[in-house]
Regions:
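Membrane-proximal alpha-helical signals and transmembrane carboxylates
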Residues: 2-9, 14-397
Length: 397
């Protein structure tokens, strides 16, 4: 009898503890998927924070054929701190705020130039915050403005930004996705500075934030554009095009890209890079750091506008040497820019701390100046493994 009573008590307790006391219906939550942080001119409330919240009814309309309901709603507040902004947002978001599904953070360029090192404490400290969220810099605009652009192809602006950046990274390589924990690691590192991808608006107009942006064949849209260089938590300049891509070559962030080299006065050859791996070594010479970098590239010839026989192995070797020289010039130019800005976005200081810990311990406080004057040597090796499906070029009659 006692055993039966005990079993009943255990069953009752199991029923009680299996309940979800903190359960919430989706229509009771304000699911925040994007956060934008801008500088605010009011010194009492220096931050302007925009939250992009999922609109379930608009999402359903957008998913159906011909639906034009907005899938997201933006709410903007000003505050002294990021945490206070989240609390103030509860006064205007008509549902319980839920930030656990945050998918990206955008920082306005003005705020980035003022400094971002203090922002991440609140973002990283929150118990519901994921540290695998990508970070972007709004180029020439505010984060609030970019979140307001109505994208014709994607349901939400946030998703469009992420997919556009990933596409650019996989096909050209001048930008890359940088996550929150990687940014925090670089901000707290004594031997590496932060670099973050930029996003901008192409075909910007008054209609960019209107539903009429759906109704044109040349709409305003968001594009991945450039790499923002930081020094000690403050943005100092932009890198663009080949210069930005060269930085990704140094840090082995290139997945695929196309390199165009001349083959005549008017003709060019396009080499598609299918693999790129870099290594860096550091040493001390006469009490000064010497940085040695090497880059190994594998590529395929994908296009030529020159009348050349690509079956000739000597010709392929010639293109390999030309591509090596071009990449070497681009990388040296990029490193030179970074040295001028005293922004070690490559992590040369971290490499030096591992190979020469005693020297690093004595000079790490002065690394920005040492990096600026450091000797850099660059070695590039290119292997063109094939010339595509055709050896001879097409000739017009």
């Amino acid at each position: 009898m006692k055993i039966n009573i005990s079993l009943l008590w255990m069953a009752a307790i199991c029923l009680l503890i299996s309940g979800c006391s903190n359960y919430r219906e989706l229509n009771e939550l304000g699911v925040i998927i994007g956060m934008g942080i801008d500088h605010n001119d009011d010194p009492k409330n220096p931050y302007k924070v925009t939250y992009q919240v999922i609109n379930p009814s608009g999402l359903a309309q957008t998913s159906t054929s011909g639906g034009k309901g907005l899938a997201v709603i933006n709410y903007t507040v000003t505050a002294k701190t990021i945490v206070e902004a989240f609390a103030r947002a509860s006064a205007i978001i008509p549902r319980e705020n839920n930030i656990s599904h945050l998918s990206l953070i955008i920082i306005g360029e003005e705020l980035a130039r003022n400094g971002i090192d203090l922002l991440y404490d609140s973002v990283d400290r929150g118990k519901n915050q994921r540290v695998s969220v990508p970070i972007f810099i709004a180029r020439g605009k505010t984060a609030e403005y970019l979140f307001g652009v109505i994208e014709p192809l994607e349901i939400t602006p946030g998703k469009n930004i992420i997919t556009t950046t990933k596409s650019e990274q996989s096909d050209y390589g001048s930008t890359n996705e940088v996550l929150l924990y990687e940014t925090i690691s670089a901000l707290t590192s004594e031997g590496k500075d932060v670099s973050l991808p930029g996003i901008s608006i192409r075909n910007d107009s008054k209609e960019a934030k209107q539903l009429s942006n759906f109704e044109t064949t040349s709409p305003a849209y968001i594009e991945a554009k450039g790499l923002a260089l930081f020094r000690k938590g403050k943005m100092v300049r932009w890198l663009d095009g080949e210069t930005a891509r060269a930085a990704q070559f140094v840090t082995s962030e290139i997945n695929r890209t196309d390199v165009v080299i001349p083959c005549s006065e008017k003709g060019n050859v396009t080499i598609t890079v299918i693999r790129a791996k870099s290594k860096m070594k550091t040493k001390i010479h006469h009490e000064k750091p010497v940085i040695q970098t090497s880059l190994n590239v594998m590529g395929e010839m994908m296009e030529t506008s020159c009348d050349l026989d690509m079956s000739n192995p000597k010709l392929l070797k010639e293109f390999e040497r030309k591509m090596e020289n071009d990449l070497k010039k681009q990388i040296k130019r990029t490193i030179s820019i970074a040295q001028k800005e005293k922004s070690d976005i490559f992590g040369f200081g971290d490499a030096l701390s591992r190979t020469n810990p005693d020297y690093w311990r004595l000079h790490k406080k002065n690394w920005d100046n040492l990096f600026s004057d450091a000797e850099i040597s660059m070695k590039v090796n290119v292997d063109i493994i094939n010339s595509g499906m055709r050896m001879e070029p097409y000739k017009s009659k």
